[in-house]
Swiss-Prot record:
Main location per the UniProt record: cytoplasm
Family designation: Belongs to the P-Pant transferase superfamily. AcpS family.
Name of this chain's protein: Holo-[acyl-carrier-protein] synthase
Origin species: Borreliella burgdorferi (strain ATCC 35210 / DSM 4680 / CIP 102532 / B31) (Borrelia burgdorferi)
UniProt cross-references to InterPro entries, sorted A to Z: 4-PPantetheinyl_Trfase_dom, 4-PPantetheinyl_Trfase_dom_sf, ACPS, Ppantetheine-prot_Trfase_dom
EC main group: transferase
GO biological processes: fatty acid biosynthetic process
Cofactor(s) the record lists: Mg(2+)
Protein residues bound to Mg(2+): 7, 55
GO cellular component, one term: cytoplasm
Molecular function GO labels: holo-[acyl-carrier-protein] synthase activity; magnesium ion binding
């Protein structure tokens, strides 16, 4: 194991995201936003969980960085794998760094009414 990252977020922080398109587009890719629209259940919990996942990855990568990389949270996309679990799809500088370092990323997300939590393990 190279590094870990964890983030916990209050779900209620994301209630106003649904009415604020600019906020949504600041943190989430168009693909993520479309998936939220198609998703049943609690969209707000899902938003919070994906945001926590992005923050967890940043925390996990930070100790590995030998140089500053430019990124936005939209460069870290959280998608559903063919198996149904959450995984990352990286873009731009974050993707280049992960490839250069030959990193393997493992993600788990959980949410329950008030809180969402994500945990990331980084290996190479």
């Amino acid at each position: 194991m190279k590094s870990i990252g964890c983030d916990i977020i209050k779900v209620e922080r994301f209630k106003n995201f649904l009415e604020n398109k600019k906020k949504m587009e600041r943190f989430f890719t168009h693909k993520e936003i479309e998936n939220f629209k198609l998703k049943g259940g609690s969209i707000i919990e899902s938003l919070a969980g994906k945001f926590a996942a992005k923050e967890s990855l940043i925390k996990a990568l930070s100790p590995l960085l030998q140089y500053k990389i430019n990124y936005t949270l939209k460069d870290i996309e959280v998608i559903k794998s063919l198996k149904g679990n959450a995984e990352f799809c990286l873009h731009n500088e974050v993707e280049k760094f992960a490839i250069k370092m030959n990193l393997k990323l493992y993600l788990t997300i959980s949410h329950e009414k008030e809180y969402a939590i994500a945990f990331v393990i980084v290996e190479n």
